[in-house]
A protein has these predicted regions:
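Conserved glycine(s) of the Walker
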Residues: 37
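Nucleotide-binding/hydrolysis machinery
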Residues: 3-12, 16-24, 28, 33, ...
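Interfacial catalytic loop of ABC nucleotide-binding domains
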Residues: 59, 76, 83
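Short clusters of hydrophobic/aromatic residues that line enzyme substrate/ligand-binding pockets
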Residues: 4-5, 73, 79-80, 88, ...
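AAA+/P-loop NTPase substrate/partner-engagement loops
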Residues: 51-73
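Conserved AAA+/SF3 P-loop NTPase catalytic/coupling segment centered on the Walker-B
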Residues: 28-30, 44, 64-71, 84, ...
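Short glycine/serine/threonine-enriched helix-capping/active-site loop
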Residues: 59, 139, 166
Length: 178
């Protein structure tokens, strides 16, 4: 199989998918092993979209424990009245990339599902709804269908985020990118 590669290291077939996806505001899941360029693809989708002049925020599901993840995603209202804005608010009108979405705890997955359904959420310790308009792109190095089978990932969330799917080959199969 022959692939044409561009200087940015994205196969021609993937660039064609990006062009199509960028014309929509739909959610995207990008699958591929670590280091294969999933973030690069997500950035390219954002850059070519109508949201390109707004924020592109990245939240890595593998790096945070449950309590920190919830605050990082939804924000936090402190006892003194101050607010720490989460990734959803920071990405409002722009794009949020949830990297390693498979690592998000199930309880938080259900809250993400609500955001996708209602376009609103509550900050940690908050009582008021916060409305957002965010394009969600998720990436994973795990097979989400297998994660669903073993009970680590919600099937309803999978169907909400999997409007478009991009599969990235490992770098060892893209020798010209190395």
């Amino acid at each position: 199989m022959l692939f044409l590669f561009y200087p940015e290291g994205i196969p021609h077939s993937t660039l064609h998918q990006i062009e199509k996806i960028s014309l929509t505001d739909s959610r995207v899941i990008i699958n591929g092993p670590s280091g294969s360029g999933k973030e690069l693809v997500a950035r390219k989708i954002h850059k070519k979209s109508k949201r390109n002049n707004k924020a592109f925020i990245i939240l890595n599901g593998a790096l945070l424990d449950k309590e920190k993840y919830e605050a990082e995603l939804f924000g936090l209202e402190k006892d003194d009245g101050s607010i720490l804005y989460g990734a959803l608010e920071k990405a409002n009108k722009g794009t949020l990339l949830i990297d390693q979405v498979s690592e998000i705890p199930l309880e938080i997955q259900s809250k993400i599902l609500r955001v996708l359904t209602d376009q609103k959420f509550k900050r940690v310790n908050g009582s008021n709804d916060v409305s957002v308009d965010v394009r969600l792109i998720c990436s994973s190095s795990k097979d989400l269908k297998k994660e669903i089978e073993i009970g680590n990932f919600r099937e309803d969330l999978f169907h909400r985020i999997n409007v478009f799917e991009i599969n990235i080959e490992p770098l060892n199969q893209r020798i010209s990118d190395i």
